[in-house]
């Protein structure tokens, strides 16, 4: 079991993107920082907002890239390479069109599924896709032509409440995730209903 050393929350920078569906991953990392009572601070070296906390004697780094989504890998690779963090010790939290709001799923490895943030991370890690993902469901607009405006839009209140609930569920299994006990975390998280 590999302990998680880096948790990345994907999103786009700037106030115009705050609270958009595409920033679900960043919201997750913000909630971790708040729970751990650490401040995310800008770090130009890693092209993002970073923080660090300790869990069972291990350092865990938080990262929200301040590059745009399709350049997230630049930020992730800079931090992972500097601290020699292997892909299997990274958890990337991101919005997931293929899951309904209120559903969160853990996954290890796989493709990018059309997600430009994941696509760039895989490329910047030297085509290594063996990192863990926290997929936060945002639903799908029903037509591929509507996806861009959908992910960059704010969710209606009821939908946002479901997303917030799925983040709460994910925070509940975070100790198991950090310890590398993904089987237990997946059993608990995947049985939750928002």
Swiss-Prot record:
It is found in: Cytoplasm. Pfam families: Pept_tRNA_hydro (PF01195). One of its GO terms (molecular function) is tRNA binding. Its main location: cytoplasm. Coiled coil: none annotated. One of its GO terms (cellular component) is cytoplasm. Hydrolyzes ribosome-free peptidyl-tRNAs (with 1 or more amino acids incorporated), which drop off the ribosome during protein synthesis, or as a result of ribosome stalling. This is Peptidyl-tRNA hydrolase. It comes from Pseudomonas putida (strain GB-1).
């Amino acid at each position: 079991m590999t302990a998680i050393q880096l948790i990345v929350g994907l999103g786009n920078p700037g106030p115009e993107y705050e609270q958009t569906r595409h920033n679900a991953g960043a919201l997750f990392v913000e909630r971790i920082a708040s729970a751990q009572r650490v401040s995310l601070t800008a770090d130009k070296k890693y092209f993002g907002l970073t923080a660090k906390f300790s869990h069972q004697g291990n350092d865990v780094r938080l990262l929200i890239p301040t590059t745009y989504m399709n350049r997230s890998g630049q930020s992730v690779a800079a931090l992972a390479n500097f601290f020699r963090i292997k892909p299997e010790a990274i958890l990337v939290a991101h919005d997931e069109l293929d899951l309904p709001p209120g559903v969160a799923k853990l996954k290890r490895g796989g493709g990018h599924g059309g997600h430009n943030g994941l696509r760039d991370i895989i490329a910047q890690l030297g085509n290594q896709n063996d990192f863990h993902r926290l997929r936060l469901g945002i639903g799908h607009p029903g037509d591929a032509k509507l996806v861009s405006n959908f992910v960059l839009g704010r969710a209606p209140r009821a939908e946002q409440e479901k997303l917030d609930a799925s983040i709460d569920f994910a925070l509940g299994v975070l100790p198991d995730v950090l310890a590398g006990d993904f089987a237990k975390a997946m059993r608990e998280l995947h049985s939750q209903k928002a």
